[in-house]
Amino acid sequence: MNVPILRLVARRIAPLAIGATTLGAAFVGAPSAASGVVMHPLVADWAFVGSSPTPPTQAQCNAATSAGGTARPRRCFNPTSMQNSYNISSLLASGNDGHGQTIAIIDSFGSAPIASDLNVFDNAFGVQHLCGEANYTCQPGDPTFKILQVQGSPPAVAPPPNNGTGLENHNLWAIEVSLDVEWAHAVAPRANILLVTTPTAEVLGVQGFPDMMKAEQFVIDHHLASVITQSFGAGEETFGSAASLLNLRGAFQAAPGAGVTVLASSGDGGTANAFKTPIKNPGTIPFPSVGWPASDPLVTAVGGTYLCTDAVTGLAIDTASPPASCQAAHNPSGDHDVTWPGSGGGYSHVFGTQPWQSAALASYAATNQTGNAPLSSNRAIPDVGYNASPTSGVLVYSTEPPVAGLFCSAGTPCSSGWYVVGGTSASSPQWAGLIAIANQMSTGSGGKTMGYINPALYQLPSSDFFDVKIGNNQTDPSIPGYKAAPGWDPATGLGTPDAAKLIPDLIAYVNSH
């Protein structure tokens, strides 16, 4: 079956067309300063590991070469081992699999073969098929896969591949789309997936970020999803002024009243943000900084870790072939997760103190970590963590566009097939899957959707999380990072989810407040 595609026409005045979805109001309040903001998909690193529809073996993953040409042994997590690692499997076994809920995934460009790639992924791992996949005959009651395309006005025009702007990053966005769709689906296999795409590259005129926010507003206004995940971002300082950033928040302000949870990847540069033009030679903000939309207090920011469990089964801590950061020399207590240095985190320079977070920030300050970046009482991220390290990455099947460009030199990553992928882009969609499960469980018992979860997260028992106490998120030697510590910290948030405990407790809190 062909994937259903809806098209959202972004014009100030647009008639309702049969067979297409239109939006009659242009994005309101988009500042000119936002037009130059460079946002990237938050895929940190990837390695091609095989072209066969059959998933690669762990030996193939260990021999993988990264996109930059470096041999980096890595472990490849599959859906079952990831579900076991974060105690999601028992929920799925009880029928709590996101049924009846819809996850909206926001991405640039999209990927034309995603319906086929998703089918390969589901066949390979025995995951529930979605109605809308290629090469699949829908069955009654199947969850769905649909695409909502935001059509820009004027339409996006692809630049020459060597113009230096980086607008040709279709390959990286293709991997991003495959990662987001396949892994939100892997966590909540019976949730509907709505892929929302814009035709805009990172800095295409006045489109870019405003198009993304307009798409999210449409999803919320038309009740198309109960959870939104976004795996892109830009440093707060790249917006030129706080006002130009604040004018983009309309969707986030509408989400709580609609009962919609909004999540975002916290970033892959630790405390260093380099989302500035020109893309090929970006500057670095010369002090610790955080990225938006993750820094928005109305968004749940998801940071990154090294997952130290066995990648084949996920049933125990890996003592045979763990990545270096999980080995005894660095992780003597055998912790479940340790900090991935790329985990975006720190304190906002735009958003002030959040009452629901102030106690956690004070507790972290009291740990008196030496060598830290400056502390603050402002909004801090991430809120929570999840596996994101490329050396403990997830398997993604992606058919890459046959074009040359910034991320396609020497055929990398233009090959189509299996990749092992890392970055907080892997973290946010999987948390979205968890929220879809929570929404199913709650509404199925007469409760409400989780909606705005940030205040609730900070009230949950610490036992609902795998606490991350080792490592820091410094990636640039000239920009200090933050050390992990017991409880919340600006590297991994409250920790990673022990889903079988966390989700029932989150449901109970949300429905009692």
Regions found by a protein language model. Name each.
Residues 368, 438-490:
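An often Trp-containing, charged/polar helix-loop segment at the C-terminal end
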Residues 297, 301-353:
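Polar, glycine-rich mid-to-C-terminal structural blocks
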Residues 33-301, 348-422, 428, 443-445, ...:
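Substrate-binding/charge-relay-adjacent region of secreted/lumenal peptidase catalytic domains
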Residues 426-439:
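Active-site-proximal alpha-helical segments within enzyme catalytic domains
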Residues 2-34:
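Secretory targeting and sorting signals
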Residues 8, 12-13, 150, 331, ...:
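Positively charged, low-complexity intrinsically disordered regions
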